[in-house]
Amino acid sequence: MTHPELLRLRDSIDNIDAALIHMLAERFKCTQAVGEYKASHDLPPADPSREAAQIARLRELAEKAKLDPDFAEKFLNFIVKEVIRHHEAIAKAGRT
């Protein structure tokens, strides 16, 4: 038995998931360039003040969008950790 409304909702979720993946890929292209810039200018991979500002900004955006700000912060922290890991790898590759 099919449920057309459920299928429609799931199609919407699938489309949003695809958009999220594409947006994350674009974000990582930008952070890759940031990592290369930092490595070439001897800057540290992490920038705690920038990260704190980003978290505050994302929490505010989440509240306005009626999304749990704690969830948004956890999501951004996960992304930031991965970005820092990439930046560290870029810096290490530049030193070898």
For every predicted segment, state its role.
Residues M1-T96:
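Domain-level signature for soluble enzymes in the chorismate/prephenate branch of the shikimate pathway
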